[in-house]
Amino acid sequence: MDQAADTIWIAEQAKGIGFDLCGVVRAEKFPELENTKDWLKRGYAGEMNYLFDPRREDPRGAMPGVQSVIVCLLNYNTDHPLSLDAKPRGQEHDPRGWISRYAWGDDYHDVLKERLQALVVLLRERFPEPFEARAYVDTGPVQERVVAKYAGLGWLGKNTLLLNQALGSYFFLGVILTTLDLEPALGEGETPPPDLCGSCRRCLEACPTQAFVEPYVMDARKCISYLTIELRGSIPKELREPMGNHVFGCDICQDVCPWNRRAPASPLVEFQPRALPRHREKASEAASQAEEDSLFIPGLDWLLTLSQEDFRRVFRGSPLKRAKWRGLVRNACIAAGNSGIRPGGTSYARILVSLQKLAACDDATVAESAQWALSRIQ
C-alpha cells in the first residue's frame, strides 16, 4: 500500500469527521522537547507536577512500539467579542467575570476524544494488520504543540502557543499515537511552517502579569490561566490586581495576536457559550439578556452565590470543572475586588452580602480571597 496515499487518506478522513486540519509525524525526539528540561529546572511549571513526567521528553516513551503520531486540530473560535473588546454596559454597577473562550461550551476533551476514536475505527478498517493506537486530548505524556509543529500544522509563537496562518491559535489539538509506520505529512527535505511572528511583541507586552520571561518562554506561575485554573491555594497578592475580571483562564495573549484577528469562527454548537439558569432578580434589557444567561461574561453576583452543589450541576461536562468550586469562587472574589463597584450599584448589595458570607466560610482560601475583596470595595 502507498504510504503517502495513506497519509493523505488519514487527513481526508479526519476532515470528514470534523477536524479542521490533520498531520502525521514520526515519533521521535524533537529539539524543543529538550528545552523543556531547562524550563522545568527554572521552576516555571509551578505546581503542575505532571509536567515532570519523563515520558514527555520523547513521544517514543509514551507508548511501547509507537512509530507515528497523528495530530488533529479543531477550531473552537466563536463570533463573540474578544476579551479586550467585551465591555458590557454598566460594568461598574453590574460587574462580570471573563471565562476563557475555549471554556464557554462543552468540555473539549469529550468533543475531541469522540472524533479521535472515530478516526481510530476508520484506521482499523483501512489497515487490517494488528496495531496499537491511543488517543489523547491534553491528557497523555505528549507535548502536542511541538509534535503538531513537525506535523506541519503551524509554528510555535512568542506566546508559546501553536499558530496557524489560516486559523490563528483558537484551536484544540488531539493526538493518536500508533504503532503503524506512516509517511510523515512533511516530505523529505520539507521543514515545518516558518515562524511568522516577525518583530511583533504584542502578546509579550499585553500580558498584565508579565508572565513572559522572554519571547517563547513563559513563567506559568505568573500566567492568569495557571493562577485561575491550576493553582489550588491562594493567589499571590501582587498578582491579584493585574488579573482584572478573569475568573477562569485568559485569552489576552491570543486576543492581541494579529493572526487571530482574521481567525474564522467554528460552526460547532458544542463551543458556543453554555446557557445558564436565570440568575437575576430582575430581568435586564433584552439586548444583554443572552450575555447574562451564558458563560460569556457571566455576572459576578451569580458566581459568588454558587454552592458546591450548584457548581457540580451547572458545570457538568464543562472545562470549568477543573478549577473546582474553591478555585472558581476564589477567582470570582478576586474579580469582585478588582471590579471598582461602589455602594449604589445595581448589584453592590448582593455582592457585598455574598462576600461577607464567603469571608466567614470554612474554606480558608476562599475566605481570605473574600476578605481581600471586601477590603477593596467597602
Model-identified regions with their sequence ranges:
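A short, charged helix-loop
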Residues: 179-182, 186, 218-231
